[in-house]
Swiss-Prot record:
The gene is purH. CDD domains: IMPCH. It comes from Xanthomonas oryzae pv. oryzae (strain PXO99A). Keywords: Hydrolase, Multifunctional enzyme, Purine biosynthesis, Transferase. The keyword Transferase applies. This is Bifunctional purine biosynthesis protein PurH.
Length: 527
């Protein structure tokens, strides 16, 4: 059994990231801790006027091979691995003194290889060998040794030393050990991922296969969830080790109940949809489908228009905005409807103050960022489906007019708006829109024509006029019936990928009804 509290008398410091190094070293020296170090770390400590002993002096071997061999020595690893109450005699026989604390971070392999111009030689030179070996030795022997791998750990480590007269608890040593093994796993995964993706080792800057032979993923637990998708399922939320700026995983929860699995799934759909728009926009999501989307003069205007699409489905929904949410809009929302989650890049003080009146509402702030996920994944039985993320946009210049009548300028704007919304509606997806707002949404049907009929039904239920609206379809129409249904509802223009064997029949149907139609050449299935 590990002793609960053990003193720190001797520490080895070897870091690539010098953040906080001198303050840590100074605090350890003040506690009469003997410092051992290597290379640039020893130089920095010495230049700060602090006593430090080079590892080369300890081992009797100089650093060699351009620093590739520094710490791979029994006097180092024996000092880290020696077990209290078991190995003292062996250590004494071979002149091995115990090392109680290892402070080490690794060569910056990840930050070097993320650069597009990184050469294979640069990558290889930043593969740390001695560092991971020492981390594993120290972490394995947590019964006696403490190990710190991140400058963010220094303050807590020093606080515990201060509170316990220079000693660290077994709980602290174990927690640091787990963090060290996690760091080594992350580091090795990054090396494996990079080398597995190298298509040709003969290239100076090697081409990287986007789908390498092996993938090693690292996710960090953010929180436990009340349950999974259903109450009988357990759940938790993990984020990428290096989250992409502006994506959902970077959220801050400002108030409200704990988040659920479904809250986060819906929030992601809402946030990804709303961040497509430059003008103030509101997206209301229910069961991962947008049920109302609008662009307006401000957040309040956008909300009113989005809500009007489907007030029934908006109840208990997730609301996302792409601009700072003002107090008046927050009041209008919370006085009118039950909301599960509010999302915005920021909030006026008045909006946050009013939200406290509805303490259970989860309020998320996601700082602005233009980052996009590079990949989408989906678990299947004992496997993983992986694809490049659907980050494909669409501009007016990419549209092909295929009908006798071309869309008007106003219709073109609405077509692009509806196309952006359809991208986030479950297939088969049909979106009716007019004046940069949704009129009706048909989602998740096995038949495309049924989705079109549902969109019209939703508009009718909301007492919205379809006549003069446009329609977006996430995939091609296999038959003309979808166009016929749209025409009977009053649709004037259609945007769709095209590519059906019966495109000619579909185009002819549009011409019969005087409907303008454009092809995108891009499909947006969403399952």
């Amino acid at each position: 059994m590990a002793s609960d509290f053990l003193p720190v008398r001797r520490a080895l410091l070897s870091v690539s990231d010098k953040t906080g190094l001198i303050d840590l070293a100074r605090a350890l020296v003040a506690r009469n801790v003997e410092l051992l170090s290597t290379g640039g770390t020893a130089k920095a400590i010495r230049e700060a006027g602090l006593p430090v002993k080079d590892v080369a002096e300890l081992t009797g071997f100089p650093e060699m091979m351009d620093g590739r061999v520094k710490t791979l020595h029994p006097l180092v690893h024996g000092g880290l691995l020696g077990r209290a109450g078991i190995d003292e005699a062996v250590m004494a026989e071979h002149g091995i003194a115990p090392i109680d604390l290892l402070v080490l971070n690794l060569y910056p392999f990840e930050s070097v290889t993320v650069k597009t111009d990184c050469t294979l030689a640069d990558a290889v030179e930043n593969i740390d060998i001695g560092g991971p070996a020492m981390l594993r030795s120290a972490a394995k022997n947590f019964a006696r040794v403490a190990v710190a791998t991140d400058p963010a750990q220094y303050a807590d480590l020093l606080a515990e030393l201060e509170a316990n007269n220079g000693q660290l608890s077994a709980a602290k040593r174990f927690a640091l050990s787990v963090a060290a093994f996690n760091r080594v796993a992350q580091y090795d995964a990054a090396i494996s991922n990079y080398l597995s993706a190298v298509a040709d080792s003969a290239e100076t800057v090697p081409t990287r296969n986007p789908f390498p032979a092996q993938i090693n993923s690292n996710f960090v637990k953010v929180m436990d969830l009340r349950y999974g998708e259903n109450p009988h399922q357990s759940g938790a939320f993990y984020r990428d080790l290096y989250p992409v700026p502006g994506t959902l995983a970077t959220f801050q929860q400002l108030q409200g109940k704990e988040l659920s699995y479904n809250n986060l799934a819906d929030a992601d759909a809402a946030w990804e949809c709303v961040r497509q728009f430059d003008a103030p926009a509101c997206v209301i999501v229910k069961h991962a489908n947008p049920c109302g989307v609008a662009v307006g003069a401000g957040c309040g205007d956008a909300y009113e228009l989005a809500y009007a699409t489907d007030p029934t489905s908006a109840f208990g929904g997730i609301l996302a905005f792409n601009k700072t949410l003002d107090a008046a809009t927050a009041k209008a929302i919370l006085d009118r409807q039950f909301v599960e989650v509010l999302i915005a890049p920021d909030y006026d003080a008045g909006a946050l103050e009013y939200a406290t009146k509805k303490a259970n509402v989860r309020v998320l702030k996601i700082p602005h960022g233009n980052g996009l996920n590079n990949y989408d994944t989906k678990r299947i039985g004992s496997g993983l489906l992986m694809q490049s993320a659907d980050n494909r946009g669409m501009s007016l210049g990419e549209l092909s007019v295929v009908t006798q009548r071309a869309p008007s300028e106003a219709e073109l704007g609405d077509l692009l708006f509806a196309w952006r919304v359809a991208k986030y509606v479950k297939s088969n997806a049909i979106v009716y829109a007019k004046d940069s707002r949704t009129i009706g949404v048909g989602a998740g049907q096995m038949s495309r024509v049924v989705s079109a009929k549902i969109a019209a039904l939703k508009a009718e239920e909301a007492k919205l006029t379809v006549a003069g609206s446009v329609m977006a379809s996430d995939a091609f129409f296999p038959f003309r019936d979808g166009i016929d249904a749209a025409a009977s509802a009053g649709i004037q223009a259609v945007i769709q990928p095209g590519g059906s064997m019966r495109d000619g029949e579909v185009i002819a149907a549009a011409d019969e009804h005087g409907i303008a139609m454009v092809f995108t050449g891009v499909r947006h299935f969403r399952h």
